[in-house]
């Protein structure tokens, strides 16, 4: 099977797309997982909506000392 792709998943801290608080990436080559990446990210001003926390379980305390998206993007 020649199935190759990358799947990307973002979790957000608020209802705004620029509030990423986590990113996960999986690369599949010829139907096999060949690479995985996951990182928590500090969203702007470390602001979270309670409804979003209930969905993914990520809290402000978990990201308060982490870099923002622009710092991890080169990875």
Where are the regions that the model predicts?
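Conserved non-catalytic scaffold segment of RNase H-like nuclease domains
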Residues: 1-75
